[in-house]
C-alpha cells in the first residue's frame, strides 16, 4: 500500500510539474493580437467613439467640416494592449488609412490632422494648432500620448523654422521630435502607413499620393524616429484620429482605416476583427 501511495504521489508531482511548465510556456509564448479593417464607414459605426465634431457620413469619417474653430476626434472603441507589465513585451503594430484634407483655398488651410495613441480615458485637448491632442509645447509626461501629425498651419512657437507644412512625430508635446516637409495636395486622397517595430522602437511613417496630377512635386514621404512606447504610453491605450480648424480651416476626412498589432509573451490571447 505504501508503495502504491508513493507511486501516486510521484505521479501527481510529475503531472503538476508538467502542468506548471505548460502554463508557463503558454504565458510566455502566447501572442495577443488585435486586428480590424474598415473599408467604408457606416452611419452607425459601432466600433468608433466620436468626440467633438467627429461623425460618419456617406462612407467616410468626417472629423471637421471646412468651418472655423472646430475639434473632431474618433477613437477605436476597444482598448489596445500595447505593452505587457508582467513580461515587459511591447507590441509590434501597423496601421494604414486614407485621408483627404479639402480647403476652399489651398493657400489658407488649418490646422491639421493626427493619428494618435493615448490613455484609455483620453478626451479632446486644446484646439487650433494643438490639434485636439496636446495642451502644451513643453514636454509633459502626464500626457502619455504619441501622435503622428499632418500639420497644415505654421505656429511660430513650436513648428519648424522653415514654416513649411509638415509631417511630424509628437511625443508628449505638440513640438515634434522629428519632422518632414510635406506638400499638401488639397482635395487629393493620401495613403498613409504607420508601423512600429518593438525590437528597435522605431516608428515609421509613409505618406503617398497615388493619384497625383502634380508630377513635378514630391508625392511620397517617409519619416522615422525612435519612440520608446513603453516609457511613454500606458499599458492599455486607445488609438484614433483628431483634426482641428482655427481662423483658417479645411474639411478633414478619413476614407478607410485598418490596424493590426501583435503583443508576444502575454498571459492571454485575443483577436478582434471588425469590418
Swiss-Prot record:
CDD domains: lectin_legume_LecRK_Arcelin_ConA. Mn(2+) binds at residues 149, 151, 159, 166. Residues 1-30 form the signal peptide. Disulfide bonds: none annotated. One of its GO terms (molecular function) is metal ion binding. Residues 211-217, 270-275 form a propeptide. InterPro entries: ConA-like_dom_sf (IPR013320), L-lectin (IPR016363), Lectin_LegA_CS (IPR000985), Lectin_legB_Mn/Ca_BS (IPR019825), Legume_lectin_dom (IPR001220), Leguminous_Lectin (IPR050258). The keyword Metal-binding applies. The keyword Signal applies. The mature form consists of two chains, alpha and beta, produced by cleavage of the immature protein. These remain cleaved, yet fold together to form one subunit. The record marks 210-211, 217-218 as: Cleavage. Keywords: Calcium, Lectin, Manganese, Mannose-binding, Metal-binding, Signal. Ca(2+) binds at residues 151, 153, 155, 159. D-glucose binds at residues 111, 129, 246-247. Heterotetramer of two alpha and two beta chains. Binds two manganese (or other transition metal) ions and two calcium ions per heterotetramer. The metal ions are essential for the saccharide-binding activity. D-mannose specific lectin. Belongs to the leguminous lectin family. This is Lectin. It comes from Lens culinaris subsp. tomentosus.
Amino acid at each position: 500500500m505504501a508503495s502504491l501511495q508513493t507511486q501516486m504521489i510521484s505521479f501527481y508531482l510529475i503531472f503538476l510539474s508538467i502542468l506548471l511548465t505548460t502554463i508557463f510556456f503558454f504565458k510566455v509564448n502566447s501572442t495577443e493580437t488585435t486586428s480590424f479593417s474598415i473599408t467604408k464607414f457606416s452611419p452607425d459605426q459601432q466600433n468608433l467613439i466620436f468626440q467633438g465634431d467627429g461623425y460618419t457620413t456617406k462612407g467616410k469619417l468626417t472629423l471637421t467640416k471646412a468651418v472655423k474653430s472646430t475639434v473632431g476626434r474618433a477613437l477605436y472603441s476597444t482598448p489596445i494592449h500595447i505593452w505587457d507589465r508582467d513580461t515587459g513585451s511591447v507590441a509590434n503594430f501597423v496601421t494604414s488609412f486614407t485621408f483627404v484634407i479639402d480647403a476652399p483655398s489651398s493657400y489658407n488651410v488649418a490646422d491639421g490632422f493626427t493619428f494618435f495613441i493615448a490613455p484609455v480615458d483620453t478626451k479632446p485637448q486644446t484646439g487650433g494648432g494643438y490639434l485636439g491632442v496636446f495642451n502644451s509645447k513643453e514636454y509633459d509626461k502626464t500626457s502619455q500620448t504619441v501622435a503622428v501629425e499632418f500639420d497644415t498651419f505654421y505656429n511660430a512657437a513650436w513648428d519648424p523654422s522653415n514654416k513649411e507644412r509638415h509631417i511630424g512625430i509628437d511625443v508628449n508635446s505638440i513640438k515634434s521630435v522629428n519632422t518632414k516637409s510635406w506638400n499638401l495636395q488639397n482635395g487629393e486622397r493620401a495613403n498613409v502607413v504607420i508601423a512600429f517595430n518593438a525590437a528597435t522602437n522605431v516608428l515609421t511613417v509613409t505618406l503617398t499620393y497615388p493619384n497625383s496630377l502634380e508630377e513635378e512635386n514630391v508625392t511620397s514621404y517617409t519619416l522615422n524616429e525612435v519612440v520608446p512606447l513603453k516609457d511613454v504610453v500606458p499599458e492599455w491605450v486607445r488609438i484614433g484620429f483628431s483634426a482641428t480648424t482655427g481662423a483658417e480651416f479645411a474639411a478633414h476626412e478619413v476614407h478607410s482605416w485598418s490596424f493590426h498589432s501583435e503583443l508576444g509573451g502575454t498571459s492571454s490571447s485575443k483577436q478582434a476583427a471588425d469590418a
